[in-house]
């Protein structure tokens, strides 16, 4: 079956005998064809499933962006752009995460914007904590530095700076360590 007549069961049947990389090739090729929106969404979801198994997080994020692009409901667009943002953060592509977040914010009302900002902040924090657990200190440092650029509360800012000071010391980044330490002392003396 080709075109708009291609159904989910046709796709499922076609990929059932193929290996994962052949499934990726076949499904990716279908995305370029004119097919029904529901079938296209099914294909994106199948690709997400495969990419997650292969830990191809950047590609997972791209598929979520694809779903958002074909979605009609604003809530679904926001949800999928937010998922894309999460996976771009996990993959370490912060610029792409910012771009995807801006797309979600463009579709959101003021209440949803607050929720989106909170969620994205949470994604960054969780990823930084995971990096710290896995002793990927340099990656954790990059995320904490990114968080400092975001709209965060004073208590969050203080906590992040304390974490950064600790990480800079462990990484031997003395210049950054002393600069942050000096900045912290200045901030503390103002209180």
Language model segments and positions:
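Terminal, low-structured helical/coil segments at or just beyond the last alpha-helical repeat
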Residues: 163, 170-191
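Alpha-solenoid helical repeat scaffolds
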Residues: 41-46, 78-82, 95-99, 115-118, ...
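Flexible helix-coil transition and linker loops at the boundaries of alpha-helical arrays
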Residues: 29-40, 53-54, 69-77, 90, ...
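Residue-level signature for tetratricopeptide repeat
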Residues: 13-14, 29-33, 50, 63, ...
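"A position-specific structural signal for the A-helix of alpha-solenoid helical repeats
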Residues: 9, 26-29, 45-46, 66, ...
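Inward-facing hydrophobic residues that define packing positions of alpha-helical scaffold repeats
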Residues: 27-28, 44, 64-65, 81, ...
